[in-house]
Curated annotation (Swiss-Prot):
Described purpose of this protein according to its UniProt entry: Together with nucleoporin alm1, tethers the proteasome to the nuclear envelope. Involved in ubiquitin-mediated protein degradation and facilitates the degradation of nuclear proteins like mitotic cyclin and cut2. Required for normal progression of anaphase.
Family to which this protein belongs: Belongs to the cut8/STS1 family.
Name of the encoding gene: cut8
Transmembrane segments: none
UniProt PTM comment: The N-terminal part (residues 1 to 72) is polyubiquitinated by rhp6, which is required for the interaction with the proteasome.
Main localization (coarse): nucleus
Gene Ontology cellular-component terms listed: chromatin; nuclear envelope; nuclear periphery; nucleus
Name used for this protein in its record: Tethering factor for nuclear proteasome cut8
The keyword Aminoacyl-tRNA synthetase appears for this protein: no
Keyword rRNA-binding (UniProt): no
Keyword tags: Nucleus, Ubl conjugation
Source species: Schizosaccharomyces pombe (strain 972 / ATCC 24843) (Fission yeast)
Amino acid sequence: METLSYSQIKKRKADFDEDISKRARQLPVGEQLPLSRLLQYSDKQQLFTILLQCVEKHPDLARDIRGILPAPSMDTCVETLRKLLINLNDSFPYGGDKRGDYAFNRIREKYMAVLHALNDMVPCYLPPYSTCFEKNITFLDAATNVVHELPEFHNPNHNVYKSQAYYELTGAWLVVLRQLEDRPVVPLLPLEELEEHNKTSQNRMEEALNYLKQLQKNEPLVHERSHTFQQTNPQNNFHRHTNSMNIGNDNGMGWHSMHQYI
């Protein structure tokens, strides 16, 4: 076995170092953060804005995103409406006439935010998209209570928005109630609740109330039909529902017309 002297080892090391120095050094290049990191450090509002901009530029993305994102629960929708209503009430100026033009101009943006939210959410609880009568009624009841709490003003022009909301709620009510015409099992009709809604709205929901009264008048026929159905399907039970309802125009699509007002 060959034994290397110190001088030989030193020479070999020098030759090796010389080879390294002749190699092309790969230097780093500046670049932005990876997309995953950018998303991690972006706040929710930024991501929301970016997503909407991408959908506007690439409409096909909307279908894919709808297929991925889960629909919000009813509780979430109602909570959103309540928060918007709180923001509206908190935006009133301190002191002064809260029914005057100045007050309306101060709260107008928050007022419209409530209407826009209703405009987006109500159709999600109407057939044919939503066919569950009880769920539809529950949401419409909550939405009606929100409209009841919208402020009114001395200037009748400022009250057009609320009147239109009642009109649309009435139509949605009619659409949901008409689901019962073909149902073999009919839930308990919430007549008292709708009467209270109509009273609070100053008879602006009378059309839906009259329709519900007509349903109640035909209730013996309905129950006879239901009894026959139960005899052939004994496992089915009557659905009991004590909540209320409301919203829309004759064909249930009236919320689309809200855009001309807001």
